[in-house]
Amino acid sequence: MNESQNESWHREPRKIRIHDESCFEYMRKAGLLAAQTLDFITPYVLPGVTTEELDRLCHEYISDNGAVAAPLNYKGFPKSICTSINHVVCHGIPGERRLSNGDTLNIDVTVILEGWYGDTSRMFVVGDKVKRLAERLISVTYEAMWKGIKTVKPGESKGGAGPNQVHGSPCSLYFLCSESIV
């Protein structure tokens, strides 16, 4: 680790910025579009479909709704959404791999609408074959997400939600590293 990396590792966590009411409507619109994109793509998450096709459909949906897909060309990222299949923890790049019955797939959607970001993701089980371990991981991480959301308050540091959401929950069986659960 070089000196600048070492310094950034130890800096104080930034506080959550408190916005006024005029900003909330923009945040809601961007977040809603990101969520609607996941609702839109849900019926297409089927065995035999490629993640490239899911990316194309999401890109068109986001563009047709007046927004930009934030990941596209961000630090060279080549796609409009992130698709993480099975053991890929996060930020997988859509491609020609066909989804199989029983795959787990996380689709991460980030949009920019009127200058505001909306970012969300959803975990899918492809087809009707669910592996018990995958079902358990999905269940406990969903629980951890809601525990973390409940800890977020104005004036709190951004780094506090991660440890708080897993302590004492079934998620403590998994490892939390940065923004990923492995």
What are these regions, as identified by a protein language model?
Residues M1-V182:
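Active-site neighborhoods and metal-handling regions in enzymes and metal-associated proteins
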